[in-house]
């Protein structure tokens, strides 16, 4: 049976690269995944080898394409989604990175960002980008590479270096150096892009000391990003959609209307609220960012960023050996009648919104001789829900009210987590039928540009909810649990002072 107009979605994440091929009805034809090594050269530093990212991308794409073709699929286009903010600088002549990719979790430029803040530069950055002066974003990472790799500044000034987030690096490699481009969502996460003018900002380039010569061209999310070379997959494919992972997940969840909100639970957790065609400025340390630009119309989003979500479970598995697989966590959490006062604050890479404390470090409170592995697991899962509650509280302070939230990401296959989340948030939690919403969003963008889908309205009509979790927690219990969490967070912040 022939399946025409399939889309290959490349989902390049923090810990693995996935290739998923979707049929036009959004059903999955083929999936391939490969993890790659995380590098921690110093305290608070996180790096990836760009060659690991590239090789894993080629491997999973070839595997998925082979499987899909064997099933009679014809692939029409590629959509790309990626870990945002992670920064690569490479030589335009050789295509080789001059330093490892500095990952979004990396905190090495915290001092630089504090010094810039002390110089009164916060408003200069925030008013243009909607972001904060934080090492999370790309600008200070680019500057660090240019300042710390011998000869890099000279090469950049000569026009021999290119900077990009992971999407740009992959597009460069996929097109054999023919296209140096990014999309508006990834550009909006660099601290170099003016989200009101929708262009690279000369003042920000001056402030961060980043030369314009290294920057990629900025395109819409559903746009022409060039073609792959035939030698990669045996035939050339157009790259027609690009978005950062959280924006792609929002698109995959069909959050096209103002007020639609989703929360993605992967390595980190990211809550994104569509605020329509106007940028909404938070007074509670939430980020204003670009949700997407499609067919000339830009929508903005209010975003809360949590650095550690699924990464806490990964730490329990790989760092402490508490579990062998993430699949064990649901049964372990359910094995306890309550949390017994154990709280985990997973500030392994500082705390994100709404605290923005880059120097914070992780802690576990309430340990006794009776504490078991199950308590650690439950505390880790609960910490994700409490952090989400912090974000929604900040949104409420900004005047946003909601009665439901759409969730996605690898963690939400855990029913216990979804039910606890609904209780702590006091809202209905909706889980989609297709869990791969990040990759699906990239596929939707490519499909829109390819003409497979006519409009965002058509995509919204295809969206299906698999499960709903209603809030069942008594308000007194909710208040008690959140008070315990807030005490744990304040104790953690106090430790770092």
Swiss-Prot record:
Sn-glycerol 3-phosphate binds at residues 14, 84-85, 136, 245. Glycerol binds at residues 84-85, 136, 245-246. GO terms for cellular component: cytosol. Inhibited by fructose 1,6-bisphosphate (FBP). Transmembrane segments: none annotated. Belongs to the FGGY kinase family. This is Glycerol kinase.
């Amino acid at each position: 049976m022939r399946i025409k107009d399939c889309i290959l979605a490349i989902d390049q994440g923090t810990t693995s690269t996935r290739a998923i091929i979707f049929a036009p009805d959004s059903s999955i034809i083929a999936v391939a995944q490969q993890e790659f090594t995380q590098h921690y050269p110093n305290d608070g530093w996180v790096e990836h080898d760009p060659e690991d990212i590239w090789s894993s991308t080629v491997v999973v794409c070839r595997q998925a394409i082979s499987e899909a073709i064997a099933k009679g699929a014809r692939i029409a286009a590629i959509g790309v989604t990626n870990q945002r903010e992670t920064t690569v600088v490479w030589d335009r002549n050789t295509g080789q990175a001059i330093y490892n990719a500095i990952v979004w979790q990396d905190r090495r430029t915290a001092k630089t960002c504090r010094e810039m803040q002390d110089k009164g530069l916060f408003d200069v950055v925030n008013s243009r980008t909607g972001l904060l002066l934080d090492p999370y974003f790309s600008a200070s990472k680019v500057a660090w590479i240019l300042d710390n790799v011998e000869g890099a500044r000279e090469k950049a000034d000569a026009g021999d270096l290119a900077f990009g987030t992971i999407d740009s690096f992959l597009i460069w490699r996929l097109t054999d150096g023919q296209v140096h481009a990014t999309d508006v969502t990834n550009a909006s996460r660099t601290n170099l892009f003016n989200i009101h003018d929708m262009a690279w900002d000369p003042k920000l380039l001056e402030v961060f000391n980043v030369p314009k010569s290294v920057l990629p061209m900025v395109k819409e999310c559903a746009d022409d990003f060039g073609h792959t070379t035939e030698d990669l997959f045996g035939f050339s494919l157009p790259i027609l959609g690009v978005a950062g992972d959280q924006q792609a997940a929002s698109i995959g969840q069909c959050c096209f209307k103002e007020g639609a909100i989703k929360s993605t639970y992967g390595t980190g957790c990211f809550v994104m609220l569509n605020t329509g065609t106007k940028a909404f400025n938070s007074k509670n340390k939430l980020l204003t960012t670009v949700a997407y630009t499609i067919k000339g119309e830009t929508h903005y989003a209010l975003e809360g960023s949590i650095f550690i979500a699924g990464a806490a479970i990964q730490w329990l598995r790989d760092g402490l050996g508490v579990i062998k697989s993430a699949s064990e966590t649901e049964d372990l959490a359910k094995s306890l009648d309550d949390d017994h006062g154990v709280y985990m604050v997973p500030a392994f890479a500082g705390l994100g919104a709404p605290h923005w404390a880059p120097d914070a470090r992780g802690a576990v409170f309430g340990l006794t001789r009776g504490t078991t592995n199950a308590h650690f697991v439950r505390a880790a899962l609960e910490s994700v829900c409490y952090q989400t509650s912090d974000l929604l509280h900040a949104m409420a302070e900004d005047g946003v009210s909601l009665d439901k939230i759409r969730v996605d990401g690898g963690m939400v296959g855990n029913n216990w987590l979804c039910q606890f989340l609904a209780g702590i948030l006091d809202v209905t939690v909706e889980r989609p039928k297709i869990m791969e919403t990040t990759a699906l969003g990239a596929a939707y963008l490519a499909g829109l540009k390819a003409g497979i889908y006519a409009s965002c309205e058509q995509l919204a009509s295809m969206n299906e909810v698999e499960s709903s979790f209603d809030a069942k927690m008594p308000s007194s219990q909710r208040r008690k649990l959140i008070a315990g969490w807030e005490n744990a967070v304040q104790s953690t912040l106090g430790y770092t002072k």
